[in-house]
Every structure is written in C-alpha cells, then in structure tokens.
Amino acid sequence: MSPSDPTPTAPVVEGWLVELGIKPTARVDRDDVVAWDLQLDGRRRFDIRFTVILDPALGLITWVHFAPPIGDGLRKSYQRLLRWNDEFPFVKFSLAEDGRPTLSTEIPFRILDRDELGVALARSLAICDALLEESAGWLWIGGRIPDLAGRVGRNPELFERYASRLPELLGS
C-alpha cells in the first residue's frame, strides 16, 4: 500500500490478521486474487469457517461458510435468508453454488484497513452467535446444539477490540 495506490497487498492483509491475533489455516493465490481460510469462534458458536478474499479489482470480501448445504424445504430457507438480509445491515446472506448458506461482507478499498477487516469479522461472528438457535437445524443433526460449557473461544480479543463499534450485536 502506498499513498499513490491505496490497494493493500497480500502481505499487508496478512499483517493485519497477525495484529488481530488471527492465524490463517491456508492461503491460496490465483492470478492477482489471494484468499485466506480462517477458523474463528463466536461467543456462542465455535469453529466458524471464513474465507477472506483480496481481489484487486473489487476490494476485500469476508465470506462465512454459514452452514452445510440446505436439505429442507428450500422456500422456507430462502425466506429466512431474505429476512436476515433485512435484519442485519452491512452483510449479505446468499447461497453458494452447492446450496450452502453463506454470509459475506464486501469492503471497498477506499475504506479498507485493519480495523474495517476486524469489524467485518467480529460482526459476522456476532451474527452467527445471534442466529445460533434459528440455524441449529442446518448445523447439527436434529438441531441439537452441542453442550459447549467451559469451552473458551480462540479469538475473544476481536470482540473486546470492536465492541464499541458493534454495540447492537455485542452489547456494549
């Protein structure tokens, strides 16, 4: 990133992830696009898979693998995703080609920095937590949420750092 070119490079984004206490599980480079796989924890929902995509033609996208492919009555699921799009600003719910519900955030380069990335990740995690009961049927057999008593999340500092920017989701 330079004053004449505000587009962050892959090493800059990797530096932001380190500063946020996040270690990618994989990196994929394809042409000019770089993607990192992450596994993060919400306060209530754990092991949430993300892909962070840096596309020099677009910006940065955080993409949450929200649930496995939907197998129930699709109409009801589509209605739920559309309702969530109305209820949660700044994010978009959609279906991947394989039928998996996804949750994404697009950050244009003009505002992209470490904190915008951190807020996007924290917001997505908080939404996953808020929708835990409603999405349990997609996530676990019989919709039974596993007992997670005593489990500690791997990235609580992310919530602490951005709680003041997400009071409606993080209760600050």
What are the roles of these predicted feature ranges?
Residues 63-104:
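Short, internal acidic amphipathic alpha-helical interface segments
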